[in-house]
């Protein structure tokens, strides 16, 4: 990281020396990471050139020094003094609500129950406004719309120039679908300049729209809450207002992470022996919402439900773990930013697996199947308004290891203590420290990986509905896992 990144700030700062052992160690560590000779306790990590990659290195090396902190802590407390005060003091205030605050939504959630004998009629979506069309899910929803519907698809693209918006959309469609839609751009596929952060969305927003599918969001899990609130929460509020204005149906894409069953900031804080269930009738069940991404998506859902109580026709679809296409295993171009994939790479290349995780499972929701499910729900759902679109064909880790063994990958199941010792050793070598970095936010204070949760996500209602309308998830079997692994080997990401 270049020293010049924060040179101006360095020249103007007043150096404040560290006073404690922890402050001294962290200041020295930051100096090494930022390539700055002398870092004081009041110096802001980001003002002096720090970024997300540097923050990951900061957290990993701090762990190696015995200082436990999370990536989100670095964003919340960017100076050494504020970070040490937090780490040595009381926990920061948690995001809390009262369950009674959500009683007003009961009439909406009561619609999402199985009613034997109920039938659903397919309805045309008409012309569609699609936000997030250049994203992983958005692009595949566009593909489904082109295959299953006949109306125009207006794609909201952030850009200041007409040529840029066309080029950006054309580039992503070519990446996923080759030349299939080249001749349709500016015909059925209409890119329009706009931004969900802008009230009104766009100066050229169409009014001949019957359905809005809102997939645009920032899906990073760490950063400032003001940013996530602006994009995910207020951005959704702007989409809702536009839907109300033109009388369009809204399909809002959310995430199952709002359940609290997620690898958030400091997982050990959230563990509980009290088992809770989160289904299509749930919103707030006392789950942790301190992760900035999850909190912003939770609040975005509230904006949609509030509008529904005022008469808006809307559906909220909470999606699961989006993975490679079923058809050919294609994945998103920015694959290195995918947290699940980062962990898969780390565990396969590490070659060790802790015995205490053998009874857990992983969920793979192929992106093309997920997009198909979104359109099925949009076409057939009537009064029902919340869906959990995640695969029920999970794969247990013991079966996953059997499959990767057959693919020639050596994996050894070891005790938790042995796994932890070996994991700590990875910090000492620059070519293996990425392994520790992949898991650093998933460990409790004893260094144990925590992937279980007291919150159980259920999707019985959605599975019943999807079966009624002719949709079923694929098996997560040898064929799919083999294709998944081979894809990342071919592009050079997996080196096993």
What is the role of each PLM region?
Residues 94-211, 215-218, 225:
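N-terminal Rossmann/SDR dinucleotide-binding element
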Residues 211-214, 222, 227-230, 234-295, ...:
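Conserved Rossmann-fold NAD(P)-dependent oxidoreductase catalytic core, especially the SDR/UDP-sugar
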Residues 264-277, 305-362, 367-372, 376:
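NAD(P)-dependent short-chain dehydrogenase/reductase
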């Amino acid at each position: 990281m270049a020293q010049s990144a924060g040179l101006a700030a360095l020249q103007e700062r007043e150096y404040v020396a560290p006073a404690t052992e922890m402050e001294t160690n962290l200041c020295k560590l930051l100096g090494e990471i930022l390539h700055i000779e002398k870092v004081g306790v009041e110096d802001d990590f980001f003002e002096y050139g720090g970024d997300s990659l540097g923050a990951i290195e900061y957290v990993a090396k701090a762990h190696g020094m015995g200082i436990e902190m999370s990536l989100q802590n670095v964003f919340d407390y960017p100076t050494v003094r504020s970070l040490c005060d937090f780490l040595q003091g009381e926990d920061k205030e948690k995001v809390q609500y009262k369950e009674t605050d959500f009683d007003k939504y009961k009439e909406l959630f009561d619609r999402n129950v199985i009613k034997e004998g109920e039938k659903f009629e397919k309805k045309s979506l008409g012309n569609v406004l699609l936000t997030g069309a250049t994203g992983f899910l958005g692009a595949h929803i566009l593909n489904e719309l082109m295959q299953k519907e006949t109306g125009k698809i207006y794609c909201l693209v952030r850009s200041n120039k007409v040529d840029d918006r066309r080029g950006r959309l054309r580039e992503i469609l070519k990446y996923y679908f080759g030349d299939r839609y080249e001749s349709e751009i500016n015909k059925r596929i209409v890119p329009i300049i706009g931004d969900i952060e802008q009230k009104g969305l766009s100066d050229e927003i169409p009014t001949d729209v019957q359905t809005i599918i809102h997939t645009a969001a920032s899906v990073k899990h760490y950063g400032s809450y003001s940013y996530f609130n602006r994009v995910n929460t207020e951005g959704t509020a702007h989409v809702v207002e536009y839907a109300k204005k033109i009388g369009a149906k809204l399909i809002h894409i959310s995430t199952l992470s709002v359940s609290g069953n997620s690898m958030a900031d400091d997982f050990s804080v959230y563990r509980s022996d009290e088992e809770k269930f989160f289904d299509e009738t749930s919103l707030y069940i006392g789950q942790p919402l301190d992760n900035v991404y999850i909190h912003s998506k939770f609040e975005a859902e509230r904006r949609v439900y509030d509008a529904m109580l005022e008469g808006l026709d809307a559906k909220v679809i909470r999606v699961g773990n989006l993975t490679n296409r079923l058809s050919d295993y294609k994945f998103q171009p920015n694959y290195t930013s995918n947290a699940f994939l980062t962990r898969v790479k780390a565990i396969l290349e590490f070659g060790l697996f802790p015995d205490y995780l053998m009874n857990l499972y992983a969920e793979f929701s192929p992106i093309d199947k997920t997009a198909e499910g979104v359109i099925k729900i949009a076409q057939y759902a009537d009064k029902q308004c919340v869906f959990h679109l995640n695969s029920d064909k999970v794969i247990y880790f013991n079966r996953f290891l059997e499959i990767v063994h057959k693919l020639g990958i050596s994996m050894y199941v070891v005790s938790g203590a042995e796994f932890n010792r070996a994991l700590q050793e990875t910090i000492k070598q620059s070519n293996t420290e990425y392994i520790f970095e992949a898991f650093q936010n998933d460990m409790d204070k004893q260094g144990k990986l925590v992937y279980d949760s007291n919150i159980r996500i259920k999707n019985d209602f959605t599975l019943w509905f999807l079966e009624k309308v002719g949709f079923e998830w694929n098996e997560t079997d040898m064929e799919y896992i083999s294709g998944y692994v081979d894809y990342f080997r071919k592009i050079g990401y997996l080196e096993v």
